[in-house]
Amino acid sequence: MAATAECDVVMAATEPELLEDEDAKREAESFKEQGNAYYAKKDYNEAYNYYTKAIDMCPNNASYYGNRAATLMMLGRFREALGDAQQSVRLDDSFVRGHLREGKCHLSLGNAMAACRSFQRALELDHKNAQAQQEFKNANAVMEYEKIAEVDFEKRDFRKVVFCMDRALEFAPACHRFKILKAECLAMLGRYPEAQFVASDILRMDSTNADALYVRGLCLYYEDCIEKAVQFFVQALRMAPDHEKACVACRNAKALKAKKEDGNKAFKEGNYKLAYELYTEALGIDPNNIKTNAKLYCNRGTVNSKLRQLEDAIEDCTNAVKLDDTYIKAYLRRAQCYMDTEQFEEAVRDYEKVYQTEKTKEHKQLLKNAQLELKKSKRKDYYKILGVDKNASEDEIKKAYRKRALMHHPDRHSGASAEVQKEEEKKFKEVGEAFTILSDPKKKTRYDSGQDLDEEGMNMGDFDANNIFKAFFGGPGGFSFEASGPGNFYFQFG
């Protein structure tokens, strides 16, 4: 009897291992049905809970894992769903929906090749399955978008890469790799808010994602927030020490910051030659950093203006606004250089651009000044006519008049052609006009200030150049021209 009891005990211990408990099976089915009901109501969290209870009761039922995988997919938890789908086909390799869900999870996560294998297996089991056929096409399309994007990235056609990634993400919405590539290209295109949004979204789900940290840093770096950018690059390298892009970006950011600061220091100390060299070196570090390079060009333009290399300064400022057409400081610097080189039309154009952007009193006055100088430049330039500087003294103006008046006097050219005589007479008259204005302090002041423009000129209607000439040289008999052969004259003054 003792032996029989011992045997019963042994039988009681092994029965649960050999026979499935019918009650457990029924309870598991009940949980599954409740899960189905919640799934139908789109209450996926409750559906997940009941499918989990069913699995706990019967862990070897493939359909339970398949159902829970479907629920996790609806919740966007594709990696967990993939695990359940894979378990379902391990338990039952003929489970077509299990293979479909496995493929769908692979595709959603961006593994198109693995997805193709799953869909192929589903088609082997059911070659007419329309869903498997369509999903197989989708997976192949994603692989094609990946290939195109890879080639276009090397070509630096970032707009095309963004397009390809958008198409791929329609089938692979949970693929961080595609999102990161898109975000990086958005950053390269200067679309920083969009790039930051994508990277931040990934970091909310995975704060240790080195690629997302790199892209966040890249956006800050290209927005000229270099110190903050370095912090993100360092964090990315902490998560992935071999992250090559983060390493290069971090090195460039530090070098750019150092060179720019050294250039600023040299400029403040008045060492313009050194500042020029440092800004030039900084410009060679990273041609992709548009905002920082725009500032560097403007800074170098300022240095060139200090060195009175005004055309070089204009070129630097032009490069700055090409990189950043909203850069007010560069427009102002270039406009001043245009004023200094008497390119008034260009100066007016730049000041108009500035005033349209920032309607301040200061900018309005700068525009008015440039417009006045432009008007003044279109009238006769009496200083040029006499060949004197704007700061010329009274004696210098008189000497210049004496020289030019004698040079262009009609009597000197009496033997020339009618055309030459006419031109010299015109110049003689202009010389007289110039002397009349510049030798009179009041008229000169009005001319210099542009008041004559508002007064519709200097009213030279009664002007006679010969009278000015006679008065200057002492009246009739005070001078004479004597010809000595063609083109030769002697001037004799009383």
Swiss-Prot record:
Gene3D superfamilies: DnaJ domain, Tetratricopeptide repeat domain. One of its GO terms (cellular component) is cytosol. The modification Phosphoserine is found at S393. One of its GO terms (biological process) is chaperone cofactor-dependent protein refolding. Keywords: Acetylation, Chaperone, Cytoplasm, Cytoskeleton, Nucleus, Phosphoprotein, Repeat, TPR repeat. Widely expressed with high levels in liver, skeletal muscle, kidney and testis. TPR repeats lie at residues 28-61, 62-95, 96-129, 142-175, 210-243, 256-289, 294-327, 328-361. Acts as a co-chaperone regulating the molecular chaperones HSP70 and HSP90 in folding of steroid receptors, such as the glucocorticoid receptor and the progesterone receptor. Proposed to act as a recycling chaperone by facilitating the return of chaperone substrates to early stages of chaperoning if further folding is required. In vitro, induces ATP-independent dissociation of HSP90 but not of HSP70 from the chaperone-substrate complexes. Recruits NR1I3 to the cytoplasm. This is DnaJ homolog subfamily C member 7. It comes from Mus musculus (Mouse). The gene is Dnajc7.
